[in-house]
């Protein structure tokens, strides 16, 4: 249950990515994921072994453990999206919100990404919220679809009829 601002750390966020925005960014996969632990690490302090282990754990969950030392700009769109999901996961969220997560990735990466999100939902009991304009496509992968229009939220699809 999320109730107050102290619960904001229970929400992970994955922004819509653009390959051009990461192309020259001089940070490794490991460093990108670690940024979501800075509130626990402390200002101007080095990560402890437990922080590094947590980063390794989430990179493994998203199948990016072999890319930890690679620069983010040297990855494909699908790989970058997995890194952003790992970044969200590292803070142990109860909910992950993804903004247009399949923008800029190919069909195979898209299918793999949705399979990963489904696995996280089922195995880790994380609620996944996807912001998308492609209702038809996401209906293949989701349990429910809501529409937000003029401050009104409506259920427009439910796999189980609930």
What are these regions (language model features)?
Residues 30, 48-67:
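Conserved ABC ATPase "signature" region
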Residues 71-75, 79:
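Conserved ABC ATPase signature
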Residues 92:
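Conserved catalytic motifs of ABC-family nucleotide-binding domains
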Residues 96-99:
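Catalytic Walker B motif of ABC-type/P-loop ATPase nucleotide-binding domains
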Residues 102-103:
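Short loop immediately C-terminal to the Walker-B catalytic DE motif
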Residues 132-133:
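H-loop/switch region of ABC-family ATPase nucleotide-binding domains
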Residues 144-158:
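H-loop (His-switch) and adjacent beta-strand-loop-beta switch element
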């Amino acid at each position: 249950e999320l109730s107050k601002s102290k619960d904001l750390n229970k929400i992970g966020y994955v922004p819509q990515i653009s390959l051009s925005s990461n192309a020259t960014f001089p940070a490794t996969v490991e460093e990108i994921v670690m940024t979501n632990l800075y509130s626990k690490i402390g200002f101007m302090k080095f990560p402890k072994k437990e922080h590094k282990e947590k980063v390794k754990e989430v990179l493994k969950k998203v199948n990016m453990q072999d890319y930890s030392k690679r620069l983010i700009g040297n990855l494909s769109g699908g790989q970058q999206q997995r890194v952003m999901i790992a970044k969200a996961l590292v803070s142990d969220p109860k909910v992950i919100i993804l903004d247009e997560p399949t923008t800029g990735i190919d069909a195979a990466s898209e299918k793999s990404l949705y399979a990963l999100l489904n696995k996280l939902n089922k195995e880790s009991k994380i609620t996944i919220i996807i912001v998308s304009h492609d209702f038809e496509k996401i209906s293949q992968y989701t349990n429910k679809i809501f529409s937000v229009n003029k401050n009104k939220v409506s259920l427009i699809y439910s796999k189980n009829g609930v």
